[in-house]
Amino acid sequence: MTSEPIIPMNYIDTHTHIYSEEFDDDRTEVVERALKAGAQHLLLPNIDEASIQPMLALCEAYPDLCRPMMGLHPTELPADPWPLLNKMEGLLTAPNAPYIAVGEVGIDLYWDDSRRDEQICVFKHQAEWALRFGLPLMVHSRAAHRELVDTLLPFKDDITGIFHCFGGSDEEAHELLQTFPGFVLGIGGVVTFKKSKLPAVLRAIVPLERIVVETDAPYLTPTPYRGTRNEPSYVPLVIAKLAEVYERPIEEVEEILLQNTHRIFQYI
C-alpha cells in the first residue's frame, strides 16, 4: 500500500461509526487525527439498540465535534422491531434530545430479501418521524432503488436528507435528484477506487451542489488506504478526488461541500 500525506481541509464527515468496537483500542487517536485533518463535525448515525449507548458516550466526550442521529438500520431489525422503534421514538421526543437526524434507516435487499415488506414498513415509519420532528433522513439503500423511491415518494416535498454512500447508475442518480429536491448524495471512498464508475456518473449527472462527503468508517476506505480500516481523517482524500472530477479548485469544493452540509443540517 502506498500512503500519502493527508492535506488538512475544512470538512464535515456526514456519516461515520467511530463509536463501533473497531475503534475501541485507539478512538482518542482517531479523533485527534480527524481534528488535525480539519474535521469540523463528525455525524454519527445509529445502527441498533446496542449502538445507542456508545454513540451517545462519544458525543458526550466530544460535544463540539460529534453529533448523534437516531434510527434502526434495515439489516438490524429484531424479530419484532416495534418495541425498539417505540424506544427510539421516545428518545427522539425526550426533552433536549440531541439528535440531528433520523438515521441510519432505509432498505437493504442485497444479502437477504426475506423481510422486504417489513423493511419497507419500518423505513416508512421512520420517514414519518423525520416529517413529524422536522429532522433530515440519513438513508441507506442497497439493491433496493425502486423500493426506496416508491417508499419515499409521499414525502418528497416535505423532508430533506442524504442518500448515503451513493454508488448507483446515471439513471438512478438522475431519478433521485429530480424526485427528491431536498436530498443530496453522500459520497465517500468509493469515488477514489480505480475501477469505480462513480466519477463518470457524478461528472455527467450530479451537480457539486447536491453532494456531501462521508466515510462510513470503518468501511469503504479511500485509495490509497483501501483494505484498511477507514476513519474520518481520510475525508480530504475524497474531497481532493471530487475537485479532480469537477475540475474545480479544492478550496472551492471544500466550501461548497460545507454549504451543502449546513443546508441539510441547519442546526450544526
What is the predicted role of each segment?
Residues 2-268:
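Mid-domain alpha/beta scaffold segments of enzyme catalytic cores
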